[in-house]
Amino acid sequence: GDILSRIFDKPLAIMSTSSYRADAGTVQGHLDIARYITTPQGEIAGKVLLVDDLADSGHTLKAVIHLLKNNYSPITELRSAVIWTKGLSAFTPDYSVEFLPTNPWIHQPFEGYDNLSPDKLLEKWKV
């Protein structure tokens, strides 16, 4: 979302969600959606593009779109964009860079932190 915000010179709003925390982020658990959306410029209104990295199961994107449509009436148009859409996804985004007909594991740069604790970090960087 940050890159598209910069390219199109549009304000960025951030909504935090979490569901993949069990087994180093490989098992989907309870979906948590933040109560508030952070944005530096006014309210969420007009045309909105919801951006995520991946439509995996599709449950998170479906839930967020439902929440936005029901709680943000100033939104007049809502579209979605992702980098990857898996074939098993229950949600089809409006825009997707790559469709993955199978269910491959997408290696994300933040995965290395899933099993990292402060103690492990101190041990790793101990001099």
Predicted regions and their residues:
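PRPP-associated nucleotide enzymes
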Residues: 1-127
